């Protein structure tokens, strides 16, 4: 409500400021009602937003199971710290085990000019303005032009080039004796190379020969597999093995095993159940009716939200199409409208028939023909999408509509601010005019009294 300064009636003796304030309170009643509506609508929008957050969480959890790759999860274990074993996060994983020893680790080719040296790194090591690196395996030649033929200049030029495939180091053989060493960027036998164009240091020799990593697989009828790096892929479908240390002669063979990641998959199911329960609880709290002294929720009796809750429950009770009840995979509804998850029952079903168990959640069929597959996670994704999708989702539209109503009410409140300010100014002028008129009458009365007294 607009307020303003005024002086109480000096002639009338009235508390005109209080009178005007009382009148303005009456005048502002429609604006006060609008402000109450804004407050109520803000609470409604906030409730929709809270439910939307819960439904978005359900959507995220359901998508984690709606993705077929989520069901291909596997866990790899190694009997030795000398080997790191991992499984694919996107493709399929073969379960089973493999036993082997690490015969050798991969190494990069390294060559050094050990027979010659210079007294300082600023001394020249070649009369050529060009050097070459030749890959022994492929025969590919890479050339590099030199502008500085000193040891330091050559090292800097090589290390400043991105396509030579080698790195250079100035090595101190002894005090006052410096030479050049080159090392391949990659490991493996194919990293072997030769150097051309360095004529001031004598011949180069292999400090380390490029070699592949080798695994000796099996314990009796063994065979070997090699890799240019210490990482091996394809020994089992989805398995990646990284060798970190060579096996000693007396070391026992290393066994790597791959098992279905039942705990990880069960955790995703539990997360979806928890998210569904969170959404159901939020909707129930927001839509509950008043009971005795207990107030109702902000959205008490809201049919749209009650329908959303019913849809979640129907998705559970509807099962997984022709496969049957979700109870078979450990999911049930309680009498108070919550979901429960029996991990033991789920894991048992998953181990017994992985493909069938997956189809309860991520199905290939669409019995209803509504574009949403029969799987529980499939249906949850479809339902949650319809509720939360930007612009078109049920909740998104309710939030947008609510915010539009708040804006309209706020604009009307602003109009009332102008109207009430004008009304208060009018009242102040009217009361001021009344005081002026009363003052004039008082003066006339005093004059008449004086005239009568003089008679």
Residue ranges and their predicted role:
Residues 1-39, 52, 56, 60-283, ...:
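Bacterial flagellar/type III secretion structural subunits and associated motility module proteins
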Residues 42-45:
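Juxtamembrane membrane-water interface segments immediately C-terminal to a transmembrane helix
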Residues 47-50:
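Amphipathic, heptad-repeat-like alpha-helical segments
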Residues 115-116, 442, 449:
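Short, glycine/charged-enriched secondary-structure capping and boundary segments
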Residues 290-292:
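Aromatic-rich transmembrane-lumenal/periplasmic boundary elements in polytopic membrane proteins
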Residues 419-445:
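C-terminal tails and terminal domains of large nucleic-acid-associated
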Residues 446-455:
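Short, charged, intrinsically disordered terminal tails
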């Amino acid at each position: 409500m607009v307020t303003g300064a005024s002086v109480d009636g000096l002639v009338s003796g009235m508390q005109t400021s209080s009178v005007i304030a009382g009148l303005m309170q009456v005048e502002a009643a429609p604006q006060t009602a609008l402000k109450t509506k804004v407050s109520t609508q803000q609470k409604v929008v906030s409730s929709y937003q809270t439910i939307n957050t819960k439904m978005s969480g359900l959507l995220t959890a359901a998508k984690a199971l709606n993705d077929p790759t989520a069901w291909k999860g596997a866990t790899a274990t190694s009997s030795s710290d000398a080997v790191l074993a991992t499984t694919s996060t996107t493709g399929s994983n073969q379960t089973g085990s493999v036993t082997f020893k690490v015969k050798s680790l991969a190494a990069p080719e390294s060559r050094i000019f050990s027979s010659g040296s210079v007294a300082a790194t600023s001394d020249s090591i070649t009369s050529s303005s060009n050097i070459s690196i030749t890959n022994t395996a492929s025969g590919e030649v890479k050339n590099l032009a030199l502008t500085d033929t000193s040891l330091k200049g050559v090292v800097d030029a090589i290390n400043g080039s991105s396509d030579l495939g080698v790195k250079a180091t100035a090595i101190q053989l002894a005090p006052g004796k410096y030479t050049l060493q080159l090392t391949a960027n990659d490991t493996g036998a194919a990293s072997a190379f030769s150097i051309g164009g360095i004529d001031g240091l004598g011949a180069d020799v292999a400090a380390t020969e490029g070699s592949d990593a080798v695994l000796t697989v099996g314990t009796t009828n063994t065979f070997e597999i090699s890799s240019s790096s210490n990482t091996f892929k394809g020994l089992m479908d989805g398995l990646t093995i990284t060798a970190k240390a060579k096996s000693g002669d007396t070391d026992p063979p290393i066994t790597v095993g791959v098992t279905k990641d039942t705990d990880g998959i069960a955790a995703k199911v539990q997360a979806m159940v928890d998210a569904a329960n969170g959404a159901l609880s939020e909707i129930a709290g927001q839509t509950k009716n008043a009971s005795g002294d207990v107030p109702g929720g902000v959205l008490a009796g809201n049919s749209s939200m009650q329908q959303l809750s019913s849809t979640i429950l129907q998705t559970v009770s509807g099962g997984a199409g022709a496969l049957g009840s979700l109870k078979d995979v450990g999911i049930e509804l309680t009498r108070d409208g919550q979901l429960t998850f029996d991990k033991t029952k789920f894991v048992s079903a998953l181990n017994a028939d992985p493909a069938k168990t997956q189809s309860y959640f991520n199905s290939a069929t669409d019995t209803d023909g509504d574009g949403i597959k029969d799987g529980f996670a499939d249906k949850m994704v479809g339902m949650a999408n319809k509720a939360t999708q930007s612009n078109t989702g049920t909740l998104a539209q309710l939030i947008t509509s609510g915010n539009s109503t708040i804006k309209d009410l706020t604009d009307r409140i602003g109009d009332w601010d102008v109207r009430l300010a004008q009304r208060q100014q009018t009242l102040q002028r009217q009361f001021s005019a009344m005081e002026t008129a009363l003052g004039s009458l008082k003066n006339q009365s005093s004059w008449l009294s004086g005239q009568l007294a003089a008679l």
